[in-house]
Amino acid sequence: MTTAIVEGSVQAVAQASGQSIAESFVMCDVIVIVDTSGSMAQRDSRGEKSRYEVACEDLEAIQKSMPGRVAVISFSDEVEFCPGGIPVYKGGSTDLAKALRFAKMADVSGCRFILISDGEPDKPEEAMSVAKTYTARIDVVYVGPEANPIGRFYLEKLAKASSGTTVTSDRASDLLSTVTKLLGNGDSV
């Protein structure tokens, strides 16, 4: 996937308005936390693309439709803020607890969180503990296989812990419409 700056991303809006990336980030009301671990390379999504590739395509469309409102954070072994809008595929493990601790800084009134993942984190109890500290809801888009009920059930439990909703997106085939539905067509969060 390209490292180009996505239209509508935090970085694009900052450049267009003469603001710093930090100033643009604080205007975001949606934080999308994207799993970039090894399993996201599975090529079982639309057009035989990987879950990661489809997630990136749809993230681009979401940011274009909601300019300056969506910040992207990626995670695998490490966590990274992605001001340009597209996470770099990292492979590796699934350190969701670390990602939730990182994103916690944005847990303020009016902010929404959407977690896009395909399975179980490395430290499920730790991730659940962090999720329970959130005041904002964490909605989950499960993009893994239906044949993995353990991963899906865990993510459902995590969403419920923060009063969030879980949606299964058929192996990332309809991620854009799923996220748009969770956000109420992008009009308000």
Give the positions of each predicted feature.
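Acidic, polar low-complexity linker/tail segments
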Residues: 1-32, 36-48, 188-189
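…and closely analogous acidic/polar surface helices at protein-protein or active-site interfaces
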Residues: 26-30, 38-70, 88-90
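A charged, well-structured terminal subsegment
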Residues: 173-188
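Residues at the starts of beta-strands that form the adenosine-phosphate
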Residues: 29, 69-71, 112, 137-139
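Conserved phosphate-coordination/catalytic loops
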Residues: 11, 49, 53, 90-97, ...
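VWA/integrin I-like adhesion module and closely mimicked acidic/polar interface patches used
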Residues: 87-94, 119-161, 167-169, 177-180
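Short beta-strand-loop
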Residues: 44, 61-106, 124-129, 151-157
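DG-centered beta-turn motif at the end of beta-strands
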Residues: 34-37, 55, 72, 110-128, ...
